[in-house]
Design a protein with these regions (language model features):
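Loop/turn-to-beta-strand initiation segments
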Residues: 84, 112-113, 150-153, 182-188
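Pre-Walker A (pre-P-loop) alpha-helix and adjacent loop at the N terminus of AAA/AAA+ ATPase modules
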Residues: 13, 43-44, 50-86
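Interdomain "pre-motor" coupling segment immediately N-terminal to P-loop NTPase/helicase cores
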Residues: 2-44
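Short glycine-rich substrate-engagement loop in P-loop NTPases that contacts/grips substrate
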Residues: 59-69, 108-150, 166
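Walker A/P-loop nucleotide-binding motif
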Residues: 82-99
Length: 230
């Protein structure tokens, strides 16, 4: 071995992350580890999977929720750059976060780059990147923002719970629009109705949610409350 030769952590892809245009196993492992960390940080349980989704809890709304469940599972299993953008809408405790986490796991396991974050945390990163006086904090936020803008699938949970400021609205538009322009896919969940979204955000954001996202309405009663009663 020539001491002048480069030494790579992954000799297969030479640390590029890709082999002949396809994601290398080393990068796949990194993305899987990162999305698992994100899910573990944000969710009470870190083992959400489609097999654990209990449709029996939905009562009269079961038939409608079966369609939602099947759509989410198919979306995750067949995810590609031709997949649609999804907007989950419905009240609290109906499984939006659970199913979005299920999608994140399957898509990541299939070798795609995935980011999963709450709207509050995601939009805060844009503000930190721009205004933080601490260089390291600003750099970390910049890395997070770049990852959210560029990953193949961005899952933005709980839109509408973030503190509404001009900066947050601007960041949300940048996130959604940049990903649309670059052909990156996004799944957004919210408790807000169409009317509430229009009242809270500007026309630019709402027109993109209306025109570029497929809406999945969630039905039923708060599952968390039902589980406490069982």
């Amino acid at each position: 071995m020539d001491y002048l030769d480069d030494i790579y952590s992954c000799p297969k892809c030479r640390d590029t992350g890709y082999i002949n245009g396809k994601m290398c196993s080393c990068l796949k492992a990194l993305y899987n580890a990162e999305v698992t960390r994100e899910l573990g940080t944000l969710l009470k349980n870190s083992d959400e999977c489609f097999e654990k989704f209990d449709l029996s809890l939905y009562g009269s709304a079961r038939e409608s929720m079966e369609i939602v469940f099947d759509t989410c599972r198919e979306y995750a299993q067949s995810f590609s750059d031709r997949s649609m953008n999804l907007l989950f809408q419905g009240g609290t405790g109906l499984g939006k976060t659970f199913l979005s986490a299920c999608i994140a796991r399957v898509v990541a396991e299939n070798g795609h780059s995935v980011c999963y974050d709450t709207a509050s945390s995601a939009l805060e990163a844009f503000e930190t990147k721009k205004f933080s006086r601490d260089i390291q904090t600003a750099e970390n936020a910049a890395v997070k923002v770049e990852r959210m803008l560029d990953c193949e699938l961005m899952i933005l949970d709980d839109l509408g719970t973030e503190m509404l400021t001009p900066m947050a609205v601007s960041a949300l538009y940048t996130l959604i629009n940049t990903r649309l322009v670059n052909g990156r896919k996004t799944v957004i969940s919210t408790n807000l109705t169409d009317a509430e979204l229009l009242k809270r955000y500007n026309a630019q954001i709402c027109s993109r949610l209306e025109g570029e996202f497929t809406k999945l309405p969630f039905f039923g009663s708060d599952i968390r409350l039902l589980k406490k009663e069982i």
